[in-house]
UniProtKB/Swiss-Prot annotation:
This is Serum amyloid A-4 protein. Residues 1-18 form the signal peptide. One of its GO terms (biological process) is acute-phase response. Transmembrane segments: none annotated. Major acute phase reactant. GO terms for cellular component: high-density lipoprotein particle.
Length: 129
């Protein structure tokens, strides 16, 4: 636990460039809420093969907030990927879902880099999203 807190603290220090701490934390909280909203929209839409689109969209919206949003998107995406990979390894075998993880990571990086998340939009997804 101490190691995890140390890593989070170090990435936080490195993530703050010249902006004030207040704006960085505000952006981080808003970015986390963007990811949360994208997750719930994905669950609400319930459209097959839409996960990459919503991952890209959540990371895109978080990155638009600024450095704090990018930081939050990276941390949340990496922790989620780590936990998912850990559970896959324990319950389903070593390489189960590896292709999905790689394509999800690519979609998240695509969104964080500011590119259009509609690149991953599946056919049949309502315009509401």
């Amino acid at each position: 636990m101490k190691l995890l807190i140390g890593i989070l603290f170090c990435t936080l220090i490195m993530g703050v460039t010249g902006d004030s701490w207040y704006s960085f934390f505000k952006e981080a909280v808003q970015g986390a809420s963007d990811l949360w909203r994208a997750y719930w929209d994905m669950r609400d839409a319930n459209v097959q093969n839409s996960g990459r689109y919503f991952r890209a969209r959540g990371n895109y919206e978080a990155a638009q907030r600024g450095p704090g949003g990018v930081w939050a998107a990276k941390i949340i995406s990496n922790v989620g990927e780590y936990l998912q990979g850990f559970l896959y390894q324990i319950y389903l075998g070593d390489s189960y879902g590896l292709e999905d993880q790689v394509s999800n990571r690519r979609a998240e990086e695509w969104g964080r880099s500011g590119q259009d998340p509609d690149h991953f939009r599946p056919a049949g997804l309502p315009k509401k999203y």
